């Protein structure tokens, strides 16, 4: 199996620590969500940023493969840390909210959003592990 890309991130101190990538493109303090101060981040924000970027790339690709031009997709991904009734530790859930320009119907947009969900590596990694809500809004 061919590896398309590999990266490394190192954390020291857990949720009250620091994380950096091997190339130092990301080099930031980590704090628990309740202590967010705008100068540090948390694992949930990093997950949301990565998943939103990956998913929007997949959505844009699916649209282009299906000859949909000028859709200008935008994806907002909400990550929730919530109680897990089956465990003492919390669990994640995700909402993916996409917006595209009014170049296709709502029905087509929903179909392509689902295709992107099946294609996106983050979606594949989380499949069956977390609840994911998909929403798309076609706007003028």
Curated annotation (Swiss-Prot):
Pfam families assigned: OsmC
Any Gene Ontology biological process: response to oxidative stress
Protein name from the UniProt record: Organic hydroperoxide resistance protein-like
Superkingdom to which the source organism belongs: Bacteria
Family: Belongs to the OsmC/Ohr family.
InterPro entries, per the entry: KH_dom-like_a/b, OHR, OsmC/Ohr_fam, OsmC/Ohrsf
């Amino acid at each position: 199996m061919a590896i398309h890309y590999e990266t490394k991130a190192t954390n020291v101190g857990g949720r009250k620590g620091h994380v950096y990538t091997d190339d130092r493109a990301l080099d930031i303090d980590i704090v628990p969500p309740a202590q967010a101060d705008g100068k540090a981040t948390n694992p949930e924000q990093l997950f949301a940023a990565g998943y939103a970027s990956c998913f929007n790339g997949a959505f844009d690709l699916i649209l282009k493969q299906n000859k949909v031009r000028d859709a200008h997709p935008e994806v907002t991904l909400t990550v929730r840390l919530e109680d897990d009734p089956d465990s003492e530790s919390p669990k994640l859930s995700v909402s993916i909210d996409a917006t595209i320009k009014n170049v296709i119907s709502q029905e087509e947009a929903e179909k392509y959003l689902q295709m992107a969900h099946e294609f996106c590596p983050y979606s594949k990694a989380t499949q069956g592990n977390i609840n994911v809500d998909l929403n798309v809004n076609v706007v003028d």
